[in-house]
């Protein structure tokens, strides 16, 4: 079960996990773990990711069609 949509949003925007890791100040391995749903980011990190990617935090956790 996918708990977040970080990887999908990155792909839709054409943004690499490496770029996000640098902007977020986290290692590539940590961002990859978030993107692959091996580790779930805290709410604070999700909010930071949403701000960096310029998306609503809801878009990182649910599909617009599911709302």
Model features per residue range: what roles?
Residues 1-15:
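A short, Lys/Arg-rich alpha-helix, primarily the initiator
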Residues 7, 18, 47:
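Residues within the helices of the helix-turn-helix
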Residues 10, 24, 35, 61:
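DNA major-groove recognition helix of helix-turn-helix
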Residues 10, 21, 50:
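The alpha-helix within a helix-turn-helix
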Residues 14-33:
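Short alpha-helical DNA-recognition segment
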Residues 14-15, 41-44:
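Residue-level signal for the short linker/turn that defines the boundary of a DNA-recognition helix
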Residues 44-59:
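DNA major-groove recognition helix of helix-turn-helix/homeodomain DNA-binding modules
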Residues 60-67:
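Short amphipathic recognition helices of helix-turn-helix/homeodomain-type DNA-binding modules
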């Amino acid at each position: 079960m996918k708990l977040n949509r970080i990887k999908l949003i990155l792909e839709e925007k054409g943004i690499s996990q490496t770029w996000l890791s640098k902007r977020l100040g986290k290692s590539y391995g940590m961002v990859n773990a978030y993107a692959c749903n091996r580790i779930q980011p805290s709410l604070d990190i999700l909010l930071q990711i949403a701000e960096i990617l310029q998306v609503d935090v809801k878009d990182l956790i649910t599909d617009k069609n599911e709302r």
